[in-house]
Amino acid sequence: MNFPIAAESSLPQRKAEHLQLCLEAGVESPEVTTGLERYRFQHCALPNLSLQALDLGTQFLGRSLGAPLLISSMTGGTETAQRINCRLAIAAQKYRLAMGVGSQRVMLRQPETTPTFDVRDLAPDILLLANLGAVQLNYGVTPAEAQQLVDRLGADALILHLNPLQECIQAEGDTDFRGLLGRIGELCAALSVPVIVKEVGNGLSAMVAAQLLSAGVAALDVAGAGGTSWSRVEGQRAVDPLLRRLGDRFGDWGIPTAESLQQVRQVSATVPLIASGGIRHGLDAAKAIALGADLVGLARPFLVAADQSEEVLDQWITELLAELRIVRFCTDSGDWAALRRPGVLRPC
């Protein structure tokens, strides 16, 4: 798939291309995996539990959730994105899941796109996360504008995404990251809501996690390697043959999700931590929780289901929750903390 983009492709057009590629093209990391397949749960043949009585609920950033699941930030800015976001928001409200929207920078440049992000009326009770590329703080976006995005969405927190590799491959990429940590710290101090920092599929290292926490970031999302590769997404968008080759070459770049999760958890035992990146079902989500995650983010599975229909999305979430419930039951884990007991999750 090839898009005839120019160096200054419009943001809505770029978002439409991203969405189409993630739905239709082969943009997964070709060889690297999440690393979660290297772990197996110890089966308990005599659980002292009732399957139906298990409570999947949890707390994150002071909010109650029906399950430790995040509909990860994906899209906005187009009519198709609006349809998908609305379906996701309705599902998030029904199942009490957290939800993030796609990058809102387009709202600053083209306010007419704002309705494509507006989901609060459909989901008044959910943990809703605004979203902005962190590097945009180096390109003129001010703390006041970030606060404006939060307020317009009615968000409970702001996600800043770090995507240096994607920016390298993107024809329109913003690649001046100098001094960005300081600007993130300034934003954390100025904003009225907590700041979450995430990668976009290449993982956070222990060193970067420590730097971000020292800057005042409230929570982290490792977004490790093993799922959608934004290097491949941008490579497939590109017309320039060099960018297309670079996109493929770096398709497996990054820290696998399981490794990134453990690195970050070693930095802080208490930081609210989200695991995402290549998690495609409840069994892997449960493994991520056992390895130290408080919340698990999934993007592409929600996107594919929501693009089909509300019914398909509903069926998929029901299956996801059933998988989490069965893991808890068959490991004799009465709560999520029990899933982290020594010996419950073992290396294969």
UniProtKB/Swiss-Prot annotation:
UniProt signal peptide: none
Pfam families: FMN_dh
The enzyme's E.C. designation: 5.3.3.2
Cofactor(s) needed for function: FMN; NADPH; Mg(2+)
Cell compartment(s), UniProt: Cytoplasm
The keyword Kinase is assigned to this record: no
Sequence positions that bind Mg(2+): E167
SUPFAM superfamilies: FMN-linked oxidoreductases (SSF51395)
Record-listed FMN binding positions: S72, S73, M74, T75, S103, N131, K198, T228, G278, I279, R280, A299, R300
Record flagged with keyword Mitochondrion: no
GO CC terms: cytoplasm
Chain residues that bind substrate: R14, K15, S103, Q104, R105, Q166
GO biological process: isoprenoid biosynthetic process
Catalyzed chemical reaction(s): isopentenyl diphosphate = dimethylallyl diphosphate
Gene Ontology terms for molecular function: FMN binding; isopentenyl-diphosphate delta-isomerase activity; magnesium ion binding; NADPH binding; oxidoreductase activity
Alphabetically ordered keywords of this record: Cytoplasm, Flavoprotein, FMN, Isomerase, Isoprene biosynthesis, Magnesium, Metal-binding, NADP
Function: Involved in the biosynthesis of isoprenoids. Catalyzes the 1,3-allylic rearrangement of the homoallylic substrate isopentenyl (IPP) to its allylic isomer, dimethylallyl diphosphate (DMAPP).
Protein family per UniProt: Belongs to the IPP isomerase type 2 family.
HAMAP family: Idi_2
Subunit text: Homooctamer. Dimer of tetramers.
Name of the featured protein: Isopentenyl-diphosphate delta-isomerase
Species of provenance: Synechococcus sp. (strain ATCC 27144 / PCC 6301 / SAUG 1402/1) (Anacystis nidulans)
Gene that specifies this protein: fni
